[in-house]
């Protein structure tokens, strides 16, 4: 069993704001919203008209640049994979390549990685379009359709890119998937002999059907702000009405601190622990007690005292019930210390990147910790009077951070919290 700390030695992000780490951080600090009318999704028959859209992004410049920077054999594999992969899986694969470069991994070191992909139903639009062609043309679908409908195909493609022959698998817990994958990464390192783990919070190729289904649940912002997309995601604001879906992905490279130091690599943060609970209660209603238990478990398992915490990257999706339940859970788990914390809502700027969100927002939280500056929570024009904690409503704040929480709660009562600590 590995007893030493596990660190984040490489990261990558691709959101509608930027495909670079510092580009995303700068956009958040400037208060730029990623939310626009959908361009790549046909919204003519659905209520949901806005989101964070990467479906029409040109990936060719990044493909060429990354292929040239990677070790030659890996660059050649990336080019080969790009010729056959659909758009969203390729977007995820390019982010893995960026994380490998950020971690400074040689080809042989990357090949030692175990691969974990967070997500499920990642190819909704591809599947729906295939079903439509199948029905309209007597089975006229591509031979590769079923392969690229499998979420596990993305894990296999990451392994192929890296030349890794270790474990590669997909983990799903709805929008808590990313933190579950980080927990699995810790277990691979501590109990299963992994030298390093690559965790990909995979992009979801959202479909009109999927968006409409969320809208019918009453989960999406579809009423007041369709003509003002940048104002639609507004956690903790009095006028919030639901979340705004978005494309996006994030990657973390995890490895033992000693191995990272021996390579002379930078450690962005220590991943101390992850707490996980289930509500056994209701598919959509959030549960304060379950969330509080996840927070408490994460701190206990990570060996982090409540008093060390300075910052919470909140799940805060902009729903009327969920935003307040999360704050109540923080109070229940952290006691009076909750009043001394800074809390912000990355979804107010990015929208909700669904299965990828815990990894995407974990990367952003670590970037903020290293910058000693936290982004503001956008669109809080009338703070909900029930909010009694500091939710960074006034904009960015300077804040040294010793340790932070990254919350993610999924439909079905999946409650997760990851804890990161500054590396001294």
PLM regions: where:
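Short acidic, glycine/serine/threonine-rich loops at helix termini
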Residues: 18-19, 126-130, 182, 208-213, ...
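Conserved catalytic cysteine-centered active-site region
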Residues: 1-3, 36-94, 122-184, 217-244, ...
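Conserved small-residue
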Residues: 8-10, 28, 96, 115, ...
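N-terminal amphipathic, basic-rich helices that act as targeting or association modules
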Residues: 1-22, 79-112, 342
């Amino acid at each position: 069993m590995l007893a030493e700390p596990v660190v984040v030695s490489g990261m990558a992000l691709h959101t509608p704001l930027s495909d670079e780490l510092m580009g995303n951080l700068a956009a958040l600090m400037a208060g730029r919203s990623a939310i626009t009318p959908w361009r790549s999704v046909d919204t003519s028959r659905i209520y949901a008209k806005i989101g964070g859209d990467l479906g029409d992004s040109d990936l060719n410049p990044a493909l060429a640049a990354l292929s040239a920077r990677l070790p030659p054999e890996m660059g050649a594999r990336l080019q080969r994979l790009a010729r056959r992969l659909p758009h969203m899986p390729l977007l995820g694969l390019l982010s893995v390549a960026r994380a490998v470069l950020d971690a400074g991994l040689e080809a042989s070191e990357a090949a030692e990685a175990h691969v974990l992909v967070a997500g499920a139903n990642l190819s909704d639009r591809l599947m729906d379009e295939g079903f439509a062609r199948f029905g309209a043309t007597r089975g006229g679908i591509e031979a590769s359709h079923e392969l690229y409908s499998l979420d596990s195909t993305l894990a296999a493609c990451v392994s192929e890119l890296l030349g890794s022959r270790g474990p590669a698998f997909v983990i799903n817990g709805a929008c808590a998937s990313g933190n579950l994958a980080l927990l699995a990464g810790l277990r691979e390192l501590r109990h299963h002999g992994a030298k390093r783990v690559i965790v990909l919070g995979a992009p979801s190729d959202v479909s009109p059907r999927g968006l409409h289904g969320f809208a019918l649940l009453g989960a999406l912002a579809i009423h007041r702000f369709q003509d003002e997309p940048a104002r639609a995601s507004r956690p903790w604001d009095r006028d919030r009405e639901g979340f705004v879906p978005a494309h996006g992905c994030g990657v973390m490279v995890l490895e033992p601190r000693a191995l990272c130091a021996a390579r002379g690599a930078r450690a962005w943060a220590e991943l101390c622990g992850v707490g996980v609970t289930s509500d056994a209660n209701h598919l959509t209603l959030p549960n304060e007690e379950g969330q509080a238990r996840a927070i408490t478990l994460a701190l206990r398992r990570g060996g982090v005292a409540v008093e060390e915490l300075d910052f919470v990257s909140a799940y805060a999706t902009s729903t009327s019930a969920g935003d307040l339940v999360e704050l109540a859970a923080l109070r229940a788990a952290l006691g009076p210390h909750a009043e001394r914390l800074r809390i912000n809502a990355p979804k107010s700027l990015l929208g909700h990147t669904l299965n990828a969100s815990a990894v995407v927002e974990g990367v952003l939280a670590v970037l903020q910790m290293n910058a000693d500056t936290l982004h503001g929570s956008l669109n809080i024009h009338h703070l909900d009077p029930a909010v009694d904690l500091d939710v960074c409503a006034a904009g960015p704040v300077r804040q040294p951070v010793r340790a932070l929480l990254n919350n993610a709660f999924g439909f079905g009562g999946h409650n997760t919290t990851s804890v990161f600590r500054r590396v001294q």
